[in-house]
Amino acid sequence: MIEIQFYNSLSGRKEKFSPSDPNRVTVYSCGPTVYNFAHIGNLRAFLFVDVLRRSLKLLGYGVDMTMNITDIDDKIIRDSIASKKSIIEFTAPWTKAFFEDLKTVSAEILEHYPKATDSIPEMVDIIQKLQKKGLVYKKDESLYFSIQKFQNYGKLSKIDTSGMKTGTRYDTDEYEKEDVRDFVLWKSPKLEGETSWDTLVGTGRPGWHLECSAMIRKVYGSGVDIHTGGVDLLFPHHENEIAQSEGAFPEESFVKTWLHSEHLLVDGQKMSKSKGNFYTLRDLIQQGLDPKAIRFLLISTHYRSKLNFSTDRIAEASANIRKIQNCLDRILELEPDIKADFYFLFSIPFVQTWKKEFEESLADDLNISKALAVVFESVKQINSLLDTNQSDSKQRIEYIQILAYFDRILGVLNFESKKDLLDSEIDSLIEERQIARKNKDFARSDAIRDQLLAQGILIEDTKEGIRWRKK
């Protein structure tokens, strides 16, 4: 087990990670609101959770991880009423699409995916405890949390509530840091056909912030070691989670370490439907982009840094995967009988060094950029050793194993011996590429080129037309 340093948003600095039980690190991550397909900004946050999970396991920790499904909120109610469907009917296909997207980008399945609507009793229990402590008031049949009565409000977002007017409220789930007010815990129904529950705290449905506090309690019984989410959730969502959970259970630790992933930009701008730069994973795949390249790009920048998503960056990600895969394929050609059940026992000193440096990079607040530098340095050295025939079978097997070890985080490599394409298959792909170029579908054209290059096929434009040859 390797010691980890995480940047804790609560303290504003890197800290030694000290879970309650290293063999069962508890992690809660804010998941999708299932009213539409997740966009690629959401996907970056979900893949950050995947890298966190894979890193904890690689560094010797046991994990017990949860990502919630928000299946009741303002947007879901609005759209379900418009579609004349029940909440369950409306959210089911979007929930299914979320899991399909995770599979497409090779995200590992977590231990728990609770739905908000399955945790109503836990929400009611939290409200009742808050009522007993005088932290709740009623207005227009809805229940609100009085933030001025909670002493530690603002400790995560460092917000100052001293200038706030007493009793100013928000019914909406999302609002800006500059306009802090009391937030709603339990909403009375306002619209015809609005989903609601008859409970001991009244007829209504939960506010968004209450849902996560309740689901954490339902899954773990108390708090967690790590809570993650996008930086846009830090306020008000996570701040309000702290207020609810610590207000109801002041004797318990709610969250030890808060990790927040930064925004994703598209061509240097914030993603927006009005700007025409709003993409889902399915949009990108329809354009011919490789899911592996999408995954690689979304995990390749440190989670606390903004990531710019662009066509050039996707092409760069494809090239980087190809660089690693081509090295692996060279070794597999020499060692075709190697099995993919690796034990990761390394005896070569420089391979041991690569392993150690890779682990140390991840243990430093998931420094993926530094980890990737180790990967590419190892690929460079392995290629050099293969070029000069300076390795035997035993050594080559270790090279395969170290690349497999790296791929426990990357999740983009293929360890099966490469099957050569038939000439007819190559001709068919080249014809498809020509059609794509004619239609100005350059994303698909580039994807086919990358596919052929990965198979060692070079394409040449000549006066007589397109020719291809094997490298």
From Swiss-Prot:
Compartmental location: Cytoplasm
Record's GO cellular component terms: cytoplasm; cytosol
Encoding gene, per UniProt annotation: cysS
Name of the protein in its database record: Cysteine--tRNA ligase
One GO-annotated biological process of the protein: cysteinyl-tRNA aminoacylation
One Pfam family this sequence matches: DALR_2
HAMAP family: Cys_tRNA_synth
Binding site for ATP: 273
The EC number(s) this enzyme carries: 6.1.1.16
Cofactor(s) needed: Zn(2+)
Organism: Leptospira interrogans serogroup Icterohaemorrhagiae serovar Lai (strain 56601)
Chain sites annotated for binding Zn(2+): 30, 212, 237, 241
